[in-house]
Each structure stands twice: as structure tokens, then as C-alpha cells.
Amino acid sequence: AFRASPINAQAEPGHYGKGWDPLTQLGADWLHGLGFRGEGMWIGVLDAGFENVDKLPIFETARQQERIHEGMDAMASQAGLYAHHRHGTSVLGTMAGFLPDSLIGTAPDAHYWLYRTEDAYSEFVIEEDYWIAAAEHADSTGVDLINTSLGYSLFDDSTMNHTAQDLDGHTARISQAMTWAAEKGILCVTSAGNSGNSEWHYITAPADAHGILSVGAVNGAGQHASFSGWGPSADGRIKPEVMALGVQAAYPHADSTIKQGNGTSFSSPILCGASACLWQAFPEKSAAEIRNAIISSAHLSTQPNDSLGHGIPDMRWAFALLANAGAANWSSMGPENSDLLLFPNPS
């Protein structure tokens, strides 16, 4: 049986504002239209700070419904989670945001545990340990998913640097820990990194972890964003696993405005929220089954490559796969016809 939310938001462009394009690119508007908007799902957000999340109007509904929970500030700042960097604010907004006609996120009805693990003003390997501590706490709360819009490769102390050969899922501590979290049944979603244009070029840790969804960035036409990190992993696995919007993606700024920006920091939570909605529809499925359906639904699933991975998922097709419905039965699942599954061929 499917576990749907009561219909409380229209799944149509005007109502979603700038949140419509990332939703429809993944076919997740269809899930929202069925009432699957993340209710009952718990998402841990491990990031660099959540400035003004306790005040911004876009999070008012989630606050009033007590769906935003303070996890931990791994750096033990007296100022607290809501006084530091705005990166986590923007990331959270792409999922949890609910500001009708301006921006509605991909999982506006989910619960969120917030964790500050990243020191946005310096880069040291201890931040990977902060992430591990937060992930352990998130696991203890029973989160279903974890979003990590962070990536580690080069540090302020160059003796700490990772190398491309380290990206095997077993070397960087944060990648080891994310693999363990996935093995424990958490669906871990992380950004592929923004090093595609740099000398580094590849994904960054923990995108090399095993059993996760690392997410690269595409534009609105489904084309690879030049900054999005490339695969494969050091041990030859397809990376990133999938793609989502990361070019001119809408997000809430800590000053209350809605802005648009680029980065796999946006593509990861956009996909994470949509994944939560899919899992809401199939609560009996495991994280691994949800992950496999998402990868199998992507438009390059049978011909993956090092820039787009398996491509852009289609949550409608993932839904059909989880419901054990083949393509011949697709029309009975709800969409009017199967040509809704087609994507533009990225160039």
C-alpha cells in the first residue's frame, strides 16, 4: 500500500514558483501530484551552517509543524546552528522550502535534522571527522536519508590532501563512513563536487563512497555543467551515479530573497528530496532498492558515462519499477502515456 499525504499543494507551475523546473526535470511533480511530498520521511542535512533558518518565512510551515530539528554543531559554537554560514540554509531550502508562488522544495513535508560539520572559513581533514560524528548522531535518530552538499580533496595543509587515487570509497575517512551509513540502511545522497573545470577534474570525497547516490549537475536542458565533477572512481565505478539541476537552481538566501545559483550543492538536495518522496510511496522498500530504482530510471542507465553517470532519473519510471510494473503497464500507473518518459539527449 502507498503512504500518501493529503493533497495540500497544487502540483502546477505557478504554485511552485522557481521550484518547478528542478521538480519536473526529475518527474517528481508527478509524485507531488499523487500526494507524495515527503511526509513521514526523515532527512539529515550535514552542512556548513543554517543562518536564519529559525526566522526565514520559507521555513515557517516546517517550523510550525515542528519538522525542523536541531542535531548538533560539531564545532560546538556558542552561537548555534542558525548563526553561521548560509550554505546549509540554501541547501535545506531546495528540499524543505515552502513559499507558495516563489519556491517550494522537492520534499516540503519531510522532517529535517540539521548538523553543522563544515568550517566554511578553513579546510582541514578534521571536518571529515565532524561529519562522521554527525552521521552517527543522525543514525541514532533514525533518519531515512542524509544529504551532504560537501566535498573534500585539497586542504589548507597540503600534507592532508587527497589524491585522485584515494577516491576508491575506502581511503578518505568521510567516504568510509558514508559507505558504512549506506550499509546500515540510510540512503546517502551527496554532491559530486564542483571541480570539473579545475586541475582536479574528478568527483570529491565522499562522492566516491559505495552504495550511495553521488549527484552531478546539469542545466535546464539536461546538459552536463562544466564545473560538475567527473568520474569514474579510482576503482572504476560509475560516478556520479545520477544528475539533477545545478545550473541556475533556485534557493533561499539568508536575507529572505530567492536567488539562483550554480553548483552540485543544489543538485544533491534536489535529488535527495525527490528520493524521499519516492521512498514515502514505498515504505516497505530498503534504501538499496530505492537507490537501484532511481539509477535504473535514469536516461543513460544502459549507457552511462564519466560526465553524466547514469543520467537524469525519472521518478515516474522509478515508481513503476518499484511497483513491479513494466513499460507495457506504464499507462495504468497514472501518466497519460509512456512518451512522458522521454528526455532530451544531452550534448
Show which residues each predicted segment covers.
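Active-site-proximal beta-strand/loop segments in catalytic clefts of secreted hydrolases
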Residues: 45-49, 72, 94-98, 110, ...
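Surface-exposed, proline-anchored Ser/Thr-rich loop/turn motifs
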Residues: 330-347
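Short, compositionally biased serine/threonine- and acidic-rich segments at solvent-exposed termini, linkers
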Residues: 323-331
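Autoinhibitory propeptides
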Residues: 1-23, 29-32, 210
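Extracellular S/T/G-rich loop segment that most often corresponds to the catalytic His/Ser-adjacent loop
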Residues: 47, 207-280, 284, 317
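Subtilisin-like serine protease catalytic core
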Residues: 30-72, 76-127, 141-144, 156-158, ...
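Short acidic, glycine-rich surface-loop motifs adjacent to enzyme active sites
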Residues: 136-168, 191
